[in-house]
Amino acid sequence: MPTSVLDSFALIAYFRGEPAGAPVKELLQKASKADKPVHMTEANYAEVKYMIVRKDGAETWREAAKILIALPIEFHPATRELAEVAADFKSRVSFSLADAFAAALAKEKKAELVTGDPEFKAVEKEIKINWLK
């Protein structure tokens, strides 16, 4: 199982039961069985929260947060080193700062980035992307 980094798109699709969330569910199940967590930045966590609260409401977020605790996801803070790489991405690519942190973490970990967000096409030559549909 390759090392994987989740973008906000992936986790939101998972929580909303969207078709793109099915491979995320499978990935999380494999990660749990292998005792090998997937990775996500705290910046992406914040993006997931505000997007769910904004569109689906605070109660939906509270339920999602309870589920999130049990998922095999290791959250990474925005260290200075990670911020440097994220800033380099953000200076060149028109995507959110949280997306820049996801790309930076994937680069740092030499991991695949799991996303369906087309804005990442701009960096697919620099990092491996597992495209969700």
Regions found by a protein language model. Give the residues of each.
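Helix-loop "lid/cap" segments that line or gate small-molecule binding pockets
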Residues: V48-R54, P72
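A generic structural signal for short hydrophobic patches within well-formed alpha-helices
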Residues: L11-I12, Y45, F120-K121
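Histidine- and aromatic-rich ligand-binding microenvironments
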Residues: L6-D7, M40-E42, S94-S96, D117, ...
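Anion (oxyanion) recognition and catalysis
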Residues: S32, I69, K107
